[in-house]
């Protein structure tokens, strides 16, 4: 695993994509778009109002958690872990937590597991998991 320290969160694009400035060391940093690995969240920019509502909720949750965090690390499998759209694919770790925030989003009903195949759209399941979670 490769680790990159986030110096600054520039923008939360949606529930599974963020723009960040990462520290490469020696006072060198780079701005990158990061896609959270292994998850898919409801879209926040869609005409489907039920999906949009859930998508905006997870976007706001992610924004809030990033603002609260004192340490943000992106972990990747390879030094250049970019996906087909040029985004870095990585696991988000907040405040030195061993479990990634990606996994937390799945466990609490804010995201589905995603391996790059067919996307899920079972919003009812997400709502049930959210109601049961304490996030």
Name each model feature, range by range:
Residues 1-135:
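Small beta-barrel nucleic-acid-binding modules, primarily SNase/OB-fold domains
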């Amino acid at each position: 695993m490769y680790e990159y320290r986030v110096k600054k969160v520039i923008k939360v694009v949606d529930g599974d994509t963020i723009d960040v400035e990462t520290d490469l060391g020696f006072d060198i940093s780079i701005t990158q778009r990061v896609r959270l690995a292994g998850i898919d969240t409801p879209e926040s920019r869609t005409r489907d109002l039920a999906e949009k509502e859930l998508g905006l909720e997870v976007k706001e949750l992610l924004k809030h958690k990033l603002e609260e965090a004192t340490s943000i690390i992106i972990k990747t499998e390879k030094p250049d872990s970019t996906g087909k759209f040029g985004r870095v694919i990585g696991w988000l770790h907040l405040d030195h937590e061993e479990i990634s925030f990606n996994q937390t989003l799945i466990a609490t009903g804010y995201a589905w597991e995603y391996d790059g195949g067919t996307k899920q759209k079972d919003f009812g399941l997400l709502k049930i998991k959210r109601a049961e979670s304490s996030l």
